[in-house]
Swiss-Prot record:
One of its GO terms (biological process) is protein folding. The modification Phosphoserine is found at residues 222-223. The lineage of its organism: Eukaryota, Fungi, Dikarya, Ascomycota, Taphrinomycotina. It comes from Schizosaccharomyces pombe (strain 972 / ATCC 24843). CDD domains: Phd_like_VIAF. GO terms for cellular component: cytoplasm. Residues 86-233 are annotated as: Thioredoxin fold. Gene3D superfamilies: Glutaredoxin (3.40.30.10). This is Phosducin-like protein C2A9.09. Belongs to the phosducin family. PANTHER family: VIRAL IAP-ASSOCIATED FACTOR HOMOLOG. Residues 207-233 are annotated as: Disordered. Residues 58-212 form the Phosducin domain. Keywords: Phosphoprotein. It comes from the Eukaryota.
Length: 233
C-alpha cells in the first residue's frame, strides 16, 4: 500500500489518524497563493469606488469578478444599514451622560457636541452634524450644553467635539480651529470621524466628490445663515 496515493481507503485511514495527512503539493500551494494575490490586488484597486464608479470599470475588469465585487460592496452597504439605529442629533442631559455616551460607546461610536447657543462656531458645527447624522445612522450623535456637562466650562473651548468608541474617548477636538475655523465643512468633520475610527475612508468617498462638496457647502451656509438670522428676529 502506498500511503501517498489518493485513494478512498487512504482517506479513511487519514481521517482515523492511522496515516499522517498528505503533504500539500507545492505547485498547488503556489497556484492558490497567486490567485489570492491577484484577487487582493483587484480588491485594493476597487476598494474606494462607489457603485457608479464600479459600473464605469466594466470594460476594464473581468465581468464575473466585477459583479462579485459589486455584490460584496452592496452586502457591506446592507450590513451597515442593518446596524442603523439613529439618524438624528439627540439632546442629552448630564445625568444621562454615562448611559447615553460612555456605556453606549461600547456598542457603537458616539459623537458628543458640547455647545453654547450664542456662539456662531457652535451653530456651524451643529448644522454640520445635522447633515452627517442621517448620512451615518450607525453613529450616535448627541449634543449637550457645555456648561451643563461641566460646571463653568469655558466658552473659549466651545464647540467641543468628543468622539467615543469601544467604551472610551477616542478623540477630543476643542473649537473648530484645527478643522478650518468658520470655513469648516462637512468633509472636514467626516475626516475627523475617520481619524477617530468611527468611519472608513470609503464611507466618505462620495462626500469628497467635488459636486457633492459644493452642494454640501451650499446647504451648510444656508443652514448657518438661517440660524444667525434667527438671532436678530
Amino acid at each position: 500500500m502506498n500511503p501517498d496515493e489518493d485513494t478512498e481507503w487512504n482517506d479513511i485511514l487519514r481521517s482515523k489518524g492511522i496515516l499522517p495527512e498528505k503533504e500539500p503539493d507545492v505547485d498547488d500551494v503556489l497556484d492558490d497563493a497567486l490567485v489570492d494575490a491577484k484577487q487582493l490586488a483587484h480588491e485594493n484597486r476597487l476598494e474606494n469606488k462607489d457603485l457608479d464608479e464600479l459600473a464605469e470599470l466594466e470594460d476594464e475588469e473581468d465581468d464575473e469578478f466585477l459583479q462579485m465585487y459589486r455584490n460584496k460592496r452592496m452586502q457591506e452597504w446592507k450590513d451597515q444599514m442593518s446596524k442603523a439605529k439613529f439618524g438624528s442629533v439627540y439632546p442629552i442631559s448630564k445625568p444621562e451622560y454615562t448611559a447615553e455616551v460612555t456605556d453606549a460607546s461600547k456598542e457603537v461610536f458616539v459623537v458628543v457636541h458640547m455647545f453654547q447657543d450664542s456662539l456662531p462656531a457652535c451653530k456651524l458645527l451643529a448644522a454640520i452634524l445635522e447633515r452627517l447624522a442621517p448620512m451615518y445612522p450607525q453613529i450616535k450623535f448627541v449634543k449637550i450644553p457645555g456648561k451643563q456637562a461641566v460646571e463653568n466650562y469655558p466658552e473659549a473651548m466651545m464647540p467641543t467635539l468628543l468622539i467615543y468608541g469601544h467604551g472610551d474617548l477616542q478623540q477630543q477636538i476643542l473649537t473648530l480651529a484645527t478643522l478650518g475655523g468658520m470655513n469648516t465643512s462637512v468633509v472636514d468633520v467626516a475626516e475627523a470621524l475617520v481619524r477617530a475610527g468611527a468611519l472608513k475612508d470609503s464611507d466618505i468617498a462620495a462626500l469628497k466628490d467635488p459636486q457633492n462638496a459644493e452642494d454640501e457647502l451650499g446647504k451648510r451656509d444656508s443652514s448657518v445663515n438661517d440660524d444667525l438670522d434667527d438671532d436678530f428676529d
